[in-house]
Amino acid sequence: MKCVNVRERLIDNAIKVIAANGLDKTTTKAIVSGTDINEAYIYSNFSDKEELLARAFDSLDEELVSKLMLHLPIMFTPGLDRESRSRMLFTSIWTFLMGNREKCIAFIRYYYSPYFIKYSADDHKLRYRPAVEMFSSVFADEADVWMILNYILDVMLSFAVRVHNGHMREEDDYVEHIFRVIYRSVEQYFKKEENSNDE
């Protein structure tokens, strides 16, 4: 087995197990179950199970921030009002969350766990620095952009997990409501645009 391939498969399997069973039941045995990978490969590729879980979260987090950075230029599209631009960005990220149930649930379970604070919080903040820098030109100078981004992510993840768990249906009016909750909460922090009708 190629080392890189095994490492990637272990990360993928860890994501699947976290999503299916939660972190408490994500044992090394469960991670390799149903594969031809021996448990020992976990310790030859990672220092311990905790590092494997952290790298699995890194993989998910990198994919999410990559998606955000891909669509973030929408916020600077000329000819559209700020709310329309914000809705387009929101829709892009929401569609990604809805289209990746397993990854979304695994992300949420790790993000709100003690593992995140202990192993991943610092790297997570560094990973989002480019997004914070881009958003800084949209928000007023006194706004805490990192806090605002965390709030937006928290709200989107909270509603996304409700949809994925079947507690709420993904309907157009429901999605619009989520957007409005977020937009109305943060619009007070936007920098005033010249020649804009935004209030």
Spans of model-derived segments:
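Amphipathic alpha-helical packing segments from all-alpha helical-bundle domains
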Residues: 65-69, 114-150
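Helix-turn-helix
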Residues: 9, 17-51, 55
